[in-house]
Amino acid sequence: MTIEGYKMILSFSNVLSDNINYIEANSCEEAYLKINRAKEINTNIDLAIIDYSMPIYKQENILNGSDVCKYLKKNFPNCKTIILTSILENFTLFDIVQNVSPDGIATKMDVSGDVFLKIIENVLSGNKFRSVFVVEQLEEIWENEVFINEKNRLILQYLSKGFKISEIANELSISEITIKKRITKIR
C-alpha cells in the first residue's frame, strides 16, 4: 500500500481526529530533515508510520526505517511509532523489536485496511502491536538460542550482504576464528 492508500483509509475512519496534519517522507534523508524542521517550529509528532525500507541518508548514517524511528523517538519521545516492512527475515524483525522497540510492527503482507486501523487503535491506546507473522518469527528466534546473540545476527547480516569473513572480522572487531566458530554453531 502507498502513503496515499494509508491516508485514504484514515480519512474514512474515525480512529484519528478530522484535523490531521500529515508529514510525508520518502527517504531517510527527507525524514531526518522533516523531523528536524518539526522540532525547530515546535510542531509535535504524535504518530509515525515508518517504512523499514527507505533510501539511506549516508551523511547522518540513517540506513533504514529503524534508524529513522530511533532518531524520531530521540527528538519526540512521546511519539507513537509503527514500522511496516516487507522484510521477512526473522533476525531482522528481531533486531527491530529488540533495538528499536516500536509501538507497532507488521509486515506489509499482514496489513489490510482493517488491520492497519487495528494497529493504529492499539498503539494509540498505549498497547504494543505485533502482527501474526512477526510474532511467529520472534518465537522462532527465541527457540534457537544462537540467534538471540546480537553478534551472531550481525554475522548473518554481513554474510547475506556478501561480506567475506575477514571483512566481517574487521567490522565487528573479532577474530576470523571466532566468526568461523559462530557460523558453525549457527548451522
Regions found by a protein language model. Give the residues of each.
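Acidic, metal-coordinating helix/loop segments flanking the phosphotransfer/catalytic sites
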Residues: E24-L47
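Short, flexible helix-to-coil linker/hinge segments that flank and couple to helix-turn-helix
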Residues: F94-Q98, P102-G104, M109-V146
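Conserved phosphotransfer cores of two-component systems
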Residues: R37-I41, Y71-N78, V100
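Two-component/phosphorelay signaling modules centered on CheY-like receiver
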Residues: M1-I23
